[in-house]
Amino acid sequence: RVIQTDPNFANFRYDRATRKLILLDFGATRPYPAEIVDAYRRLMASAIVGDRSEMSAAASAIGYFRADIGERQRQLVLDVFLHACEPLRHVGAYDFGNSDLAARIRDASLALSTERDSWHTPPADALFLHRKAAGLYLLAAKLKARVDVRALFLPYASRQAPS
């Protein structure tokens, strides 16, 4: 449950002999509480099947929604999550190099910014994790990677994080 949250490409080295990615910089590592890890797992698993109700419950557990959030704002946030989980929702190798996902997330996020009355800053754990996810997406796009993200995630989709 420890994540290195710095998306800088220079923090890693690829070892061709072992075919492993090696982390060089541990300065931005953060422990994540089991309940946050489990809520993100639920969020991603429910996004795969398009279960907006479960996505909403998981996002609430992470801390995305204030108690007074309007339904429109809630749905806009869920739209962004569905976009962000597109590589997970895709069956087979996702083509990061030919994806316009970053632009679509930007556009969906702009819609959120017009609803200032019900917006609040997500918890720091969420912000650091999103920074890392965005960095991984940009790296995969730069490398024109084709990755079956869904197949990588599914074996872990129903596990609970150890306490």
Residue ranges with predicted function:
Residues A10-Y14:
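Hydrophobic residue at the +6 position relative to the catalytic HRD Asp in the kinase catalytic loop
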Residues D15-S163:
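Helix-rich C-lobe and terminal helical cap/extension of kinase-like folds
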